[in-house]
């Protein structure tokens, strides 16, 4: 029994394992459930072989908000126009259209246009130079000690402090 449970659990967690025999048939990447009939507050999104893929109102709202606010820069112009015109049509047609568009969306990094500040959590130092990270470029944090500060103050070739990074401009939706 001790060996049977981990094997069964690992099989249940795999993506393509059929779990219909215990009544846990899922659809829409685990957000929906396959049923004969959807409840009053649920919406039918797809077909599960002979059943309907039913999704609750929270999942519908989550998908709608993600498509409206999370991916406006990723979608091409045709899809954006279709989404705008779909607001006037029935909710079922809109959801079916949104779900057909989901596989076409390219994955992008949410943090692609954002600069991060690295703050070291190491031992206490006298001073530290903190640098920003730009996409595709790796920078390292350098720390200076008292002896390095005295040498750089005495030398005539000490470099000026680095210029501040450009202001971060994010597109507004």
Curated annotation (Swiss-Prot):
Recorded superkingdom: Eukaryota
Main localisation: secreted
GO cellular component: extracellular region
Keywords: Antibiotic, Antimicrobial, Defensin, Disulfide bond, Secreted, Signal
GO biological process: defense response to bacterium
Disordered: region residues: 144-173
Cystine pairs: 27-53, 34-48, 38-54
Biased composition (Pro residues): 159-173
Subcellular localization: Secreted
Cleavable signal peptide: 1-19
Family that this chain belongs to: Belongs to the beta-defensin family.
Function: Has antibacterial activity.
Protein name per the record: Beta-defensin 129
Lineage, top ranks: Eukaryota, Metazoa, Chordata, Craniata, Vertebrata
UniProt gene name: DEFB129
């Amino acid at each position: 029994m001790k060996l049977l449970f981990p094997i069964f659990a690992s099989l249940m967690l795999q993506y393509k394992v059929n779990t219909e025999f215990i009544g846990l048939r899922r659809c829409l990447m685990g957000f929906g459930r396959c049923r004969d009939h959807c409840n009053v507050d649920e919406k039918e999104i797809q077909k599960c072989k002979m059943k309907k893929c039913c999704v609750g109102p929270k999942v519908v709202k989550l998908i709608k908000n993600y498509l409206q606010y999370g991916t406006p820069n990723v979608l091409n112009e045709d899809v954006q126009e279709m989404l705008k015109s779909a607001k006037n049509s029935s909710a079922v047609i809109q959801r079916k259209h949104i779900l057909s568009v989901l596989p076409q969306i390219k994955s992008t990094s949410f943090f692609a246009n954002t600069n991060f500040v690295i703050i070291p959590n190491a031992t206490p130092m006298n001073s530290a130079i903190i640098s920003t990270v730009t996409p595709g470029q790796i920078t390292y944090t350098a720390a200076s000690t008292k002896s390095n500060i005295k040498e750089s103050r005495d030398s005539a070739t000490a470099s000026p402090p680095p210029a501040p990074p450009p202001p971060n401009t994010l597109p507004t939706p």
